[in-house]
Amino acid sequence: MPSVLGSMMVASTSAAASLQEALENAGRLIDRQLQEDRMYPDLSELLMVSAPNSPTVSGMSDMDYPLQGPGLLSVPSLPEISTIRRVPLPPELVEQFGHMQCNCMMGVFPPISRAWLTIDSDIFMWNYEDGGDLAYFDGLSETILAVGLVKPKAGIFQPHVRHLLVLATPVDIVILGLSYANVQTGSGILNDSMCGGMQLLPDPLYSLPTDNTYLLTITSTDNGRIFLAGKDGCLYEVAYQAEAGWFSQRCRKINHSKSSLSFLVPSLLQFTFSEDDPIVQIEIDNSRNILYTRSEKGVIQVYDLGHDGQGMSRVASVSQNAIVSAAGNIARTIDRSVFKPIVQIAVIESSESLDCQLLAVTHAGVRLYFSTCPFRQPLARPNTLTLVHVRLPPGFSASSTVEKPSKVHKALYSKGILLMTASENEDNDILWCVNHDTFPFQKPMMETQMTTRVDGHSWALSAIDELKVDKIITPLNKDHIPITDSPVVVQQHMLPPKKFVLLSAQGSLMFHKLRPVDQLRHLLVSNVGGDGEEIERFFKLHQEDQACATCLILACSTAACDREVSAWATRAFFRYGGEAQMRFPATLPTPSNVGPILGSPMYSSSPVPSGSPYPNPSSLGTPSHGAQPPTMSTPMCAVGSPAMQAASMSGLTGPEIVYSGKHNGICIYFSRIMGNIWDASLVVERVFKSSNREITAIESSVPVQLLESVLQELKGLQEFLDRNSQFSGGPLGNPNTTARVQQRLVGFMRPENGNTQQMQQELQRKFQEAQLSEKISLQAIQQLVRKSYQALALWKLLCEHQFSVIVGELQKEFQEQLKITTFKDLVIRDKEVTGALIASLINCYIRDNAAVDGISLHLQDTCPLLYSTDDAVCSKANELLQRSRQVQSKTERERMLRESLKEYQKISNQVDLPSVCAQYRQVRFYEGVVELSLTAAEKKDPQGLGLHFYKHGEPEEDVVGLQTFQERLNSYKCITDTLQELVNQSKAAPQSPSVPKKPGPPVLSSDPNMLSNEEAGHHFEQMLKLAQRSKDELFSIALYNWLIQADLADKLLQIASPFLEPHLVRMARVDQNRVRYMDLLWRYYEKNRSFSSAARVLSKLADMHSTEISLQQRLEYIARAILSAKSSTAISSIAADGEFLHELEEKMEVARIQLQIQETLQRQYSHHSSVQDAISQLDSELMDITKLYGEFADPFKLAECKLAVIHCAGYSDPILVHTLWQDIIEKELNDSVALSSSDRMHALSLKLVLLGKIYAGTPRFFPLDFIVQFLEQQVCTLNWDVGFVIQTMNEIGVPLPRLLEVYDQLFKSRDPFWNRVKSPLHLLDCIHVLLTRYVENPSLVLNCERRRFTNLCLDAVCGYLVELQSMSSSVAVQAITGNFKSLQAKLERLH
């Protein structure tokens, strides 16, 4: 039944909409989580510093270092650092120490993975990773005082010289080149610098004298500037260039401390430059182009290198005493001795903080944070040096049991990690590691600390250059991406742990700073499994959701070495990941064990299990958004819902579902995997030059390498979700125990006097609601993960091809859409874009004559949700279609086209029908257009719902029927559009293609597909014949309608189809344009020799009330109906047809009178508005005779028409007839009053003759006596010719005997009128004229009646003569007497 299928279709549509809605909801969860991850505080916020003039202090509270004392937090034993390896010094170097005479130094060059050692005038370098690849330089004769590694300025040296080694002696400064044999020319990539291939060029590139300056340290900027610190307290720079100029040397030394100053030094700033205070450290902030120096006495100076890094200006200097004083004022209770001396300064780059720029570390481990410009002004240049925060090391809180750091001699600060080496004794150091990676979102800053013993005295401590993921910043997300880098916990899935190297006389110590995921791995391995108290504590410390996200990094790992750990992590994920809960915020009390700092009411609604030994995790975890952020909660407070019933039961309102840590952890992990690209633009425009012109290309915003990384992570997550389907089925263990259910319904209070069993049932049902809601959400997330993986896999595939070419093949609208589309949009909603991109990719293969089978299979494997089996079929069909264009053989081309048609027909309900049909038109495969369109219509509506909808009057409530009906019409439109195109082409002017578009020489037409008129006509006929074969009734109807609209009714009537007559009958009954369809219907009947039916349709047309049909047309319809009826009676002798013919003839007679009335009104009264209405009424319908007389002829005084009406009706009233004739004559005379007598006589004669010929045969309506008498009176009055009336009657055809009879009676009636007008002889004159006519032309009377008529005339003349004799004699009487006598003689001769 259609209704059943309709329900199925509605269900299918509803399912698709539900899936889309689920994806949208999952996408919103990810949006929120991503926003949460991006809301991490700046360093200044962690330090609670609001402005440079509002300094703060920290480190004195127990919670600043929550691990520093017992009882603060029950946390697992988490290692902060992990030793990778210890590598002893190469034996060759140990021997060299025996030859030392003056000086030795040691350090690290992380960019080239080398450690270095100077012994007197020699320098040695080796790979600190393994102690190998030892190299040395002994080309100097003086003791080396300072060493520096420089990345050279661009464009000065050959590509293989990637670094410069700068050596300073008491005499000169030598710059050597470091060459790498395995550098790819022009690539800028150093291939495996740690595995050899490095060579120290023996000849110095530059050498210049020191001018007796003792240099202590060398540093360089990223753009190649070299700075040196002098023992004299001056800052020097070595400026170098490729060639010497007119006014500059190739290499020269500049003293920035003694050179002329380009600025006015503020009076408050006291600079001291003396040999007593050497500069011992130079630090460069390459992110802001600022240089800092630290002197031996603790003076810190600030230099501004300018926006471009090429300038130089000293802007601030602060002495150690000033710093100690400022620190003492901030931390008033602390002994000021811990604030000096400063042993290290470190740059805080813009990627870590916008407001804090410099950190100084004292010998007691105190950190001093400085700012050089106002807060919240990232582009401001440095203008001061202000202490904004004092951070005390562990051990300063009241309850701390940790020993305070002391004798710190080396310090390293890197991305929030502070490493300090303190001298325990002469032989050993203690390595401190302090960081806030565990609490990156917590304000104020909370840190963990760890100490470990290091053998030997630390000579150097350095961070090894770490991998950094570039932020994808595009026009769509640039306002949402923080300037600073995300915390480690957010990036730990894609960045390795930070690596450090410590050098001592014993060798190199390599170690990692562990990320939370590394710490979790350590716990899993040490506990040998996924459970244990330590692991549970880890989940509590980091919160369930954050710990689950971290756990997933291990659980989703596909590395072979992680297989066992992955299984343990999976177990921990499900064991400690929590469960969905129902929360009642209004009743949850603050846990009693939460201290004053953590027990803020803002956390009182977080679900904390009763009796938990832990402080509220929302104030400690990573991040501090709450254990289950409200954004991931689902309100369940709809009226009448089960949640509301439970609320009523306990006197509460507003319960909400709080998803489990497992659910939220999956969201967090997915958001972090996708975070770098989720809301980024898909593409960016790049401008490059080619042949001196700029070309704009559209490129992917994400490089392939990043896509590969994201895909690997997504694949692991997808496999995890597929592998562990139980994640949506409830927790491990028995979920139905009462105790556990109560825990999951946080804040649900037991009624004091309530029904315990009923409450337990409510609790159980609540829990099941929460579980079901979470299950639905997780299924949506799983689908989102799957779609994301496939969308990105497709994007990577596009990038691996010629991306700009593929995008260039897209339509302009898709190209523009791409620019405003994010990866999120691509995944969730932009199926059209993905389809267009895939089509473009395949088209590139086809264009290059490459088979699409391979790429099609690859797409099916890579992204089956985006490229299905049907898509593969479509690609194959498209390939056949495109290749057919290149085939010369007509037979082969047709074979390929038919094969493509078969492929398209398999998927016709999904194919882009208009596009394919357009291509078929281009190759003139019109059969394909018809067949494919009809197949598509059938597949889109297999049950014929569209026809059912049409035949039942297109009811509004049948939504499914309307949809299928419209889909069918859209399919048929491809056929009718093609037919229209052929019709237009067949009618096009033959010469039009040759009309030039502009003046100039002739241009040959470049369109090879242009059809001639004849070809177009031929293809039209062929296509129409093919279309007529269809058994699809709805298509036939669509075809008929198109033929009508295209004014091809003749073609329509040639169609022999069982559907045509019913369609025309239906449309003639229901369509607004009924006249057109009825006109076609009678023509159809007539063509098929159904004359009786044609006559009846024509009769209905004539009778139809419509302003579209004129009265003239109605007469034509009646006339055609009469002809058809006569044809019908000629074929068959059915009585009804004869009667109908008679009715038609009568109808025709009345209709003619109606036309006469209308024409008379138009002719005589067209200027009257009321007459116009009457004329329109006469057009609108056929009227009966009574209505014509009463509403038109009589009111408008249309005497002729009234005469016609009574004549037609057979109504005889002599008085009325006389009146009408009199009116007719008088009107004619009145209308011609302005004319001459002869013209008036002519006009009246014409009118009388016209009417006389109509009515003379019916004396009742042509009263000759009255007419002649009235006319003669008018003639006499107007003094017209005496023979006018006789002549007129003669033209009418009135016989002379009858006319003589009328005149004779008129004469004998002795009417006094003639005497009144003084023309008593007028009638005798008329009779004389009449008889004279006879005498002169006897043939006017029939031969058989001539003798009798002659005798009658003689008798009459005798009588007239007698009458004349009785009259008094006058000239007139004598004249007429003579005339009659003469006439008498002539008559006698005729006798």
From Swiss-Prot:
GO terms for biological process: atrial cardiac muscle cell action potential; miRNA processing; mRNA export from nucleus; nuclear envelope organization; nucleocytoplasmic transport; protein import into nucleus; protein localization to nucleus. The keyword Glycoprotein applies. It is found in: Nucleus, Nuclear pore complex; Nucleus membrane. It is a peripheral membrane protein. Glycans are attached at residue 526. Belongs to the non-repetitive/WGA-negative nucleoporin family. This is Nuclear pore complex protein Nup155. It comes from Mus musculus. The gene is Nup155.
